[in-house]
Amino acid sequence: MKLRTFIPVLVVLIFATSTAAQQVTSGGPRRGYTPEPGAKDLKAVLFNWTWHMGMLRGAQEVEAVATLEHQATGVIQVDGQPCRLSKYRVSTNYQAGGQRVQYTCARPNGQQYSNIEVVSGQFAWNEDIVGAEIVPGKGKATPMVAALTERLIRLWAGPQGAPKAAIAGGDKTTVAWENNKAVVTYPIPGVPGAVAKATLSDKYQAERVEVAHNGVTTEFTYGKYDDWNNELNKVEAFYAGTLVEKRNGATIRDLTTTETETGNVYVVVPVPASVRASAQK
């Protein structure tokens, strides 16, 4: 028999703590609660949603997914044009409300384009290198105040972010049943007035999340859920294999998952001082 060596994965990023994100921490029904077969109340739906996603951890079955690494291929929109990806990596810290998206893609004319998009709490910025300006003189961080809402919506409407935000919504989260499918309505953390409606499949995994905010409708569709972790690190935590994002009907991102790391790798990131200063002006 071959012995497998498991190597811990360390991802060092740096995200600021936000009040909204701190509310989206470990939660959900505790062990000792088991929904009755066919139960359709909110408590049962939230339990089944996180259970079928593999997000309940430990003997107490507490929702304790803190971070996510996600890699994909596909096409995203850049300056209104499709850009085919050669690299797409998302590093998420749910407890800090932070997410960094690194990507490189080719425009229709073949020109290469790269960017690093970051959101952390109530701050959004772009980087020319990972962790720009954290070490003085290293890299450039560009504030992106106008992108804050879009990035927070993407974070909390994601396959894992949605159930976390729904749990954090407390009495503002509701459930209805349409065509024998649970539809969970919840507020998007950190975006006042943004309301999400998540339609779950018969396996209690989000197949569609629609977010309405200030006249803009952002729709996320998900499919082909699986454990996309490396073969040496399968943990039966499931993530969408296909992810499509549309804004007012126009496709913004069309992604196919290649790999995830759902074992709570270390993801942390401070907001650069220049970004904080810009937000205070």
Please report, for each region that a protein language model flagged, where it lies by residue.
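Boundary at the C-terminal end of the N-terminal hydrophobic targeting segment
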Residues: 20-22
